[in-house]
Amino acid sequence: MAKKDYYEVLGLQKGASEDDIKRAYKRLASKHHPDKNQGSKEAEEKFKEINEAYEVLGDDQKRAAYDQYGHAAFEQGGGTGGFGGGFGGADFGDMFGDIFGDIFGGGRGRQRVVRGEDLRYDLEISLEEAVKGTTKDIQINTLAHCDSCGGSGAEKGSKVETCPHCHGSGRIRRQQGFFVSESICPTCHGSGKKIEKPCRSCHGEGRVHKKENLSVKIPAGVDTGNQLRLAGKGAAGENGAPAGDLYVVIHVREHNIFERDGSNLYCEVPISFATAALGGEIEVPTLDGRVKLKIPAETQTGKLFRMRGKGVASTRSGYAGDLICRIVVETPVNLTSEQKELLHKLEESLQGKDLSKHAPKSSGFLDGVKKFFDNLGKSDK
């Protein structure tokens, strides 16, 4: 009897996308699964047919061979011109058995043991917490061993035997021509076990969804994007396998005063017009509290002051960066008539021949403008 076209089995056209193939397989496999159609030989055969089609169409290499040669690509010794001979009747299953055993966590007759999944948790902290270090309590959604059955998946007193179909490996290996493929055992769903009476709490899975509370110690100096690995705090493994890890990804909130660049902190410090001209002493904020900073006379906007060791300590070297303060001279606003009059008098006293002495930048700028227009006038003549 001729085999059905694999695309037809999955209800697809030949040009179907990878996602279309996956969706069709999941839908049909669920519909015709033996557990949902107990005692139905027709459903069992259909399920095998669906798995066989997906094993080929779900693999890029096999699909390409099938598209070119059809079922002949997977018949022993035929279809691909050159692959049929040269191996002296070698058993490809034996040749690749060890490889597949390593990949899928067990060889023939051994129960499949799968490490638990790694989990990710995104944690937002303040800049102060990032710089100083802290401890945060978090709650994660994870898979834990079922307390009712101890992770076995079986009710107490129920027999747990090796799956007779896959002999405990959890996978079925098939040889099709020069291809060797493995798929999850449809009888035990990959567990490698045959359970007489599945646990009612976990439905035979051995694991249950659970919320778990953890305390995470955040070291000083972390930054956005840093990951903290908590070994063994991920999802529980299957069949007694070790749990995965939990990765806590740090996100540092923006600060209303400081900006961070590596180990250095930056902030803008406004000072009055008078302090900028005459000099004085001001207080600037740091993450350790207020610190006094001397402002020399004639300080301009943009002047940088470096406060060494007031930045962030490196998580590797422990060396602390600096706090860099950028001065911004603030123009006075909401002036009274008297204050405006005083400023007019000051402006008048600074004008004239002494402008270059009191305002060198303004004087230089005005001289540059005058020369520009003088040269412009000469070029027009």
Curated annotation (Swiss-Prot):
Binds 2 Zn(2+) ions per monomer. The keyword Secreted does not apply. A zinc finger (CR-type) spans 133-211. Its main location: cytoplasm. Gene3D superfamilies: DnaJ domain, Heat shock protein DnaJ, cysteine-rich domain, Urease metallochaperone UreE, N-terminal domain. Keywords: Chaperone, Cytoplasm, DNA replication, Metal-binding, Repeat, Stress response, Zinc, Zinc-finger. CXXCXGXG motif repeats lie at residues 146-153, 163-170, 185-192, 199-206. Coiled coil: none annotated. SMART domains: DnaJ. CDD domains: DnaJ, DnaJ_C, DnaJ_zf. One of its GO terms (molecular function) is unfolded protein binding. This is Chaperone protein DnaJ. It comes from Haemophilus influenzae (strain 86-028NP).
